[in-house]
From Swiss-Prot:
Protein name: ATP synthase subunit alpha 1
Residues where ATP binds: 172-179
PANTHER family: ATP SYNTHASE SUBUNIT ALPHA, MITOCHONDRIAL (PTHR48082:SF2)
GO cellular component: plasma membrane; proton-transporting ATP synthase complex
Biological classification of the source: Bacteria, Pseudomonadati, Pseudomonadota, Alphaproteobacteria, Rhodobacterales
GO MF assignments: ADP binding; ATP binding; proton-transporting ATP synthase activity, rotational mechanism
Length: 509
């Protein structure tokens, strides 16, 4: 006997509910299989509709990027450990491309090429995602480089100036100080408002930790994004790392900010791309690099530039390593032709304890001169001439040739200028301090001093020029020429400082 208070629905109610419910929608997914495995790559079959650069998800939790499209098979670059992937495991399409978190939440963070934390902090959340690959801005959206980017290094700011929006290559053999120049440039942006991005490609973990420590010590980590793809990571992460760095930079530039991107280094990036291409059986070319290696770096560096009004800028400092000072190797020549100039670090100068070891005879800035402060231009031009004459005369002097008074004076002046260009690591100098030291050296105030004495004299001049109120910072900031009155003020201040240290007799009155 059925009671009216029975809470159970009747059969008729159940039938009506089923009929009124929307029809079920089957979940359709394309599933492939792993057919081959290599070091950092996989060959996948069964995904005929996959697109180039699409992300694929493997059943093991590793993701990969479609690199090669061939009939019946896909060449996939893995973004995780290949040892975690098994033969025959399922692979699914995602319909999306590789993206990275961008925006203010990334500042002060150390992340990998996918934006995953490397600093033992929480994941970057509440941030928009941007594809790591993007088209470079067209010509009409760019404006000429016209504003300086101060590196804080005398040898660079005076003779090889860099402008906001420029692509300036840092090139040299191993252990010549390439990373030091890049890090010192970042440290010099502390009070400029420039957002900095340091991208480590294939670097050892201890080397990256050293850079992070320097940024923390210089109170610049909060203004910097560190993207690290170490030598222990999957090759695919090292490949996409510089593109991810550019995407993060573009997000800030779109907000009108000036951004500095250091890519350390593109030699490792090129080797990684060669390794992946050979594993995927792409035809090798010169030095076994694939034929599109130039395009790989060109499309990356073309994303930097000075953009339209209110759109900010991206300054790129790519680093490349040479072997035995061979500037004509394949990758160095490619990057020299892509960029707007190069800062060449010479092993010969390193052996003479000249740091930074910038060889001004080979280094050049093709567009930065237009952005250089006028006060520096005359000093920088004379600097190159003086050093060039000094190096030529120095070669003759080694043969013991008898030298006349004028030649000895030129050698003394050249040695003083070379000493003036020495600078310790992690000690970027303000522009007016650089100008004061260089003017003092060019006018002979440091002639006859050895390296130690010249270092002490430069410190005294820096302290004195900081304490003096000569209007030098305003002259540089206002892009004014260095007047005779300003030059006289520099020399008077420098002579007084040297006199107090007991080294005033080195001045050339």
């Amino acid at each position: 006997m059925r009671h009216d208070t029975d809470p159970r629905p009747s059969t008729a109610d159940l039938i009506d509910a089923v009929l009124d419910a929307p029809p079920p929608r089957p979940e359709v997914s394309e599933v492939g299989r792993v057919a081959e495995l290599g070091d950092g790559i996989a060959i996948v079959t069964g995904l005929a509709r996959a697109l180039a650069d699409e992300v694929l998800d493997f059943a093991s939790g590793v993701s990969g990027i479609v690199f090669d499209l061939e009939p019946g098979r896909l060449g996939v670059v893995l973004l995780g450990p290949s040892q975690n992937v098994a033969m025959g495991e399922d692979v699914r399409r995602t319909g999306r491309v590789v993206s990275v978190p961008v925006g203010p939440a990334t500042l002060g963070r150390v992340v990998d090429a996918l934006g995953r934390p490397r600093d033992e902090r929480d994941p970057v959340t509440d941030s928009p995602l941007a594809p790591v690959e993007a088209e470079a801005p067209d010509i009409l959206s760019r404006t000429p480089v016209s504003r300086p980017l101060a590196t804080g290094l005398k040898a660079v700011d005076a003779a090889v100036p860099v402008g906001l929006g420029q692509r300036q290559l840092i090139i040299g053999d191993r252990q010549t100080g390439k990373t030091s120049i890049a890090v010192d440039t970042i440290l010099n942006q502390k009070d400029t408002g420039v957002i900095c991005i340091y991208c480590a490609i294939g670097q050892r973990g201890d080397a990256v930790a050293k850079v992070i420590g320097a940024l923390q010590g210089g109170e610049m980590l909060g203004q910097t994004v560190v993207i690290a793809a170490g030598d222990e990571d999957a090759p695919g992460l090292a490949y996409i790392a510089p593109y991810a760095a550019m995407s993060v930079a573009e997000s800030f530039a779109a907000q009108g900010r000036d951004v500095l991107v250091v890519l350390d280094d593109l030699t490792h990036h090129a080797r990684t791309y060669r390794e992946l291409s050979l594993l995927l059986r792409r035809p090798p070319g010169r030095e076994a690099f694939p034929g599109d290696i130039f395009y790989v770096h060109a499309r990356l560096l073309e994303r930097a530039g000075q953009f339209g009004e209110g759109a900010g800028s991206i300054t790129a400092l790519p680093v490349v390593e040479t072997q035995a000072e061979n500037l004509s190797a394949y990758i160095p020549t490619n990057l020299i032709s892509i960029t707007d100039g190069q800062i060449y670090l010479s092993p010969k100068l390193v052996r003479t304890n000249q740091f930074p070891a910038v060889d001004l005879g080979v280094s050049v800035s093709r567009v930065g001169g237009k952005a250089q402060a006028r006060a520096f231009r005359a000093v920088g031009g004379n600097l190159r001439v003086t050093l060039s004459q000094f190096e030529e005369l120095e070669e003759f002097a080694r043969f013991g040739t008898r030298l006349d008074e004028d030649t000895r004076a030129r050698l003394a002046r050249g040695g003083a200028v070379r000493n003036a260009l020495r600078q310790a690591e992690r000690d970027p100098m303000a522009a007016h301090e650089q100008l004061a030291v260089l003017v003092a050296a060019m006018e002979g105030l440091l002639d006859g001093m050895d390296e130690a004495a010249a270092g002490a004299a430069m410190q005294a001049i820096r302290a004195a020029i900081r304490a003096a109120d000569g209007g030098l910072p305003e002259i540089i900031a206002g892009d004014e020429k260095l007047t005779e009155d300003a030059r006289g003020h520099i020399l008077a201040t420098a002579r007084a400082a040297l006199a107090q240290t007991g080294r005033g007799d080195g001045a050339d009155a």
